[in-house]
Amino acid sequence: MFGFLKQVGDYTRDAVDAARNLTQGLSVTFDHMKRRPVTVQYPYEKLIPSERYRGRIHYEFDKCIACEVCVRVCPINLPVVDWVMNKETKKKELRNYSIDFGVCIFCGNCVEYCPTNCLSMTEEYELAAFDRHSLNYDNVALGRLPTSVTTDPSVQPLRELVYLPAGEVQPHGVSPDRPRAGKLPEQILEELKAAGSMKAAEDERESSSSASNMEESAG
């Protein structure tokens, strides 16, 4: 008898524990359901990096003095500085400068310790390539200014998305009760359908008017 009661008690305790764990998991799930979406539809939508984002390194050839401080402070000795000594001026003459972004860890030490500020971090993060050798940027590629996400005409930046209120950039911590800045996808689809129907009606009127004009001219 006591063994049966013990089994019933153990079963009840396990059932209560399982229900408690299930409730805790569902509470987390329901809490996330009330939040605004964070995922963006890349590449048609892109996140706007922060002001201190450490993206692709920009290099100014004219400012570089070939001191190789960037090489010494780099954890992996990554930058390759090709220079020769000018015997007349007794100064270094820089020939080439390259950084392999397939190996770079984007720590920013080279930018921080550069004495002439010829290196800077940009907001460019799209460095994917089919060939790893193409990730080795020379001084010409490093000198190219990146296209800003906020001025890229081919994408819709996050601050203009339908998910966020006007003036908001970060999706975290935004109250779901605040009105959205843009339009919902179904609203945009309805507008496109309405514009298409209006265009079709205009084309039909033009075709009918042209047909009537042809009949009048023929008569």
Swiss-Prot record:
Subunit structure as annotated in this protein's UniProt entry: NDH-1 is composed of at least 11 different subunits.
Protein name (Swiss-Prot/TrEMBL): NAD(P)H-quinone oxidoreductase subunit I
Lineage of producing organism: Bacteria, Bacillati, Cyanobacteriota, Cyanophyceae, Synechococcales
Reported function: NDH-1 shuttles electrons from an unknown electron donor, via FMN and iron-sulfur (Fe-S) centers, to quinones in the respiratory and/or the photosynthetic chain. The immediate electron acceptor for the enzyme in this species is believed to be plastoquinone. Couples the redox reaction to proton translocation, and thus conserves the redox energy in a proton gradient.
Localization terms from the record: Cellular thylakoid membrane
Family: Belongs to the complex I 23 kDa subunit family.
GO molecular function, one term: 4 iron, 4 sulfur cluster binding
Pfam hit, one: Fer4_7
Catalytic activity reported: a plastoquinone + NADH + (n+1) H(+)(in) = a plastoquinol + NAD(+) + n H(+)(out); a plastoquinone + NADPH + (n+1) H(+)(in) = a plastoquinol + NADP(+) + n H(+)(out)
GO cellular component terms given for this protein: plasma membrane-derived thylakoid membrane
Co-factor note (free text): Binds 2 [4Fe-4S] clusters per subunit.
Domain 4Fe-4S ferredoxin-type, first and last residues per copy: 55-84, 95-124
